A protein has these predicted regions:
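Long amphipathic N-terminal alpha/beta scaffold segment
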Residues: 1-17
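C-terminal, well-structured catalytic/ligand-binding subdomain of enzymes
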Residues: 1, 17-243
Length: 243
């Protein structure tokens, strides 16, 4: 996964730190390019990982049994450079890191091929959002919510406007000021303007993932159903309607 072809669209993510930390994210993409696999793995034999698979062994989001959760959103820049594809970077972080501090250190040193906002939270309630881009140092922030521009800075207004990046972020920031519960946040993520239904142009919300690293469980939400998984759950299948 080195210097992958450019791919982008949407996604929204929010970190809830504190005593019961959570990471909630919407994945907005082309349904035809989605693997629709939730992978529970123990590749190293030392650290189990649970997350949404991409490119067979990469991850779009996930959590490990140490209590570290991670997800991504496209960072708004169209350029591609020398570096690893972000799915394998997220896999590496969850395979090798136990805390937000360790994950930030890893993201500082790993070159990436495109720009992304990477949200992190651990079971101790520590959090960070890291903007990574090809050819530049990682930018570390304490932002709780990000959509599809560089942290809270719009660099490419046309793309941001096309996918309502600012509008979605404004809604997430508004929610954050009300100190929402995880349930309230999930409900908002499943409703406009955060949820998207432009499936015909590859901009539909394929799932809302809710990671609870202290509890060791993750739940994938859709309009009509939810599916909670833990590290010890057996293989299973769910069929869902996206719209």
């Amino acid at each position: 996964m080195w210097r992958l072809p450019a791919f982008a669209v949407g996604c929204s993510q929010v970190v809830l730190p504190g005593e019961q930390p959570a990471l909630v994210r919407n994945y907005d993409y082309d349904q035809a390019l989605f693997e629709a696999v939730i992978a529970s793995t123990d590749y190293s034999g030392r650290r189990r990982v649970l997350g949404t698979s991409d490119m067979l062994w990469g991850l779009l989001d996930g959590m490990n049994e140490d209590g570290l959760a991670v997800s991504l959103t496209f960072g708004g820049r169209p350029d591609v450079g020398e570096g690893f594809g972000i799915p394998i970077v997220l896999r590496y972080v969850l395979e090798t890191c136990a805390t937000v501090e360790q994950a930030v250190s890893a993201l500082r040193r790993i070159p990436v091929s495109q720009s992304y906002n990477v949200a992190l939270v651990d079971s101790a309630g520590h959090h960070a959002t890291v903007f990574v881009a090809p050819g530049q140092p990682a930018e570390v922030s304490e932002l709780h919510a990000t959509t599809n521009h560089r942290l809270d800075q719009v660099e490419h207004p046309t793309h941001a406007a096309r996918f309502n990046s600012v509008g979605r972020l404004s809604r997430l920031d508004e929610l954050r000021t009300g100190d929402p519960s995880g349930r309230q946040l999930v409900a908002a993520m499943l409703a406009p303007p955060v949820r998207n239904d432009q499936f015909e142009v590859g901009f539909g919300t394929l799932y809302t993932a809710e990671y609870q690293p202290a509890a060791g469980v993750a739940t994938w939400h859709w309009l009509e159903t939810s599916w909670t998984r833990g590290f010890d759950d057996p293989d299973d299948i769910r069929e869902v309607r996206l719209a």
